[in-house]
Amino acid sequence: YSGYRHARADLYAGQPMVLVPPEIYDPDIILWAEEALSPAAFGSFSITTAAKHDQIIAYTSQLAHVVSSAFIKSPTAQKHRGFSAGSYKDLTRVAELNADMWTELFMDNADNLTEEIGVVITELERYRDALSRGDEAELHALLEQGSIAKRKADGRYSDAREGGVR
């Protein structure tokens, strides 16, 4: 879904806007940009460096596309109809992509994306190994760690032993 025919007034409402100015920039230009972009009703407005942008985008966007593309290649994907619901839809939404565009984006950010793929491979191996060994305690610990990591990443982690939200 791209191009003018899919445009709508609220397309960016509530979404983050990240500006990556040159190393030396005029704060007045940033203020001008915030004002010029305000009709789009972005949910947040951030300023960052190119290096940090590329690192975070490798994780938040590009990795999701790689994982989705890899996941859908399972032979089981061709047999899913009638069995799948929200989880399948969530994980495969971005698998149908523009290969030309994403190849270029991935190659331009290969170092960051390769690092993130390595993290996922390591974690998947931990799950596979726990399952192969029949190690229920390890599997439970891995799942709990993932749940905690999600809450921490979203800024809503609470640990009663520590007395509140972290």
Task: Say what each PLM segment does.
Residues 1-45:
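Rossmann-fold dinucleotide-binding core
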Residues 11-17, 40-62, 78:
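Conserved Rossmann-fold dehydrogenase catalytic segment
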Residues 24, 52, 98:
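Residue-level detector of flexible, active-site-proximal loop/helix-junction positions
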Residues 35, 148-151:
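Charged/polar positions on well-ordered alpha helices
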Residues 44, 56-93:
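Substrate/ligand-engaging "lid" and interaction regions
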Residues 79-149:
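Interdomain hinge/lid region at the active-site interface
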Residues 154-166:
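Long, positively charged, glycine-interspersed low-complexity recognition regions
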